[in-house]
Amino acid sequence: MLPALKSATAGHHARVEALMPSLDALAAPEGYAAALRALHAFHAAWEPAVWRAPGFAETGLVEAERRKLPLLERDLRALGVAPLALRLPAPDVPDAAAALGALYVLEGATLGGRVIYRHVAGPLGITPVRGGAYHHGYGAATGERWKAFGEAARRWVSIHGGEDRVAAGAVACFAALEAWLATPGVLHAAPPLARAS
């Protein structure tokens, strides 16, 4: 299941990565703050739609264990960075298949977040409890949680079918993230962070 989703979304994934600040830019206060603000606004629109999609409870995935929006909110507060004034419209996530596809994007970002965390923690003085909660993700359990997500998606598709609809949901979420990051003002320079003491 995960390889099929990776293949279906490869082009969008590459374009999103190209739009995001580089690792070196993220290790600078303004770049890190801008990325947090952009991701916070995206999750604020997409997470509620994913978790409230009709039939999503049947996936067995637990919202309280996987929501990233509270982590992003905590990071912004800890670093004294205001959320973006720009907002995304609520997306249309019509069913569990589309929600699984979108969650593939949101959960997959956790893997990349671990790489970012290791690169920026020292230069920025962030920790999992001060400004780095989102990028720290599930910590040492990140790989295990990713595999568990993949197994839940595979199991759901084996019962309900609709692998093509899951892939379409992932493509839709990636396309929305791509469009959001390309929106003027979304990744503009943010106020500098207060370095951890």
List where the protein language model places each region:
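Metal- and O2-centered redox machinery and metal/ROS homeostasis
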Residues: 1-197
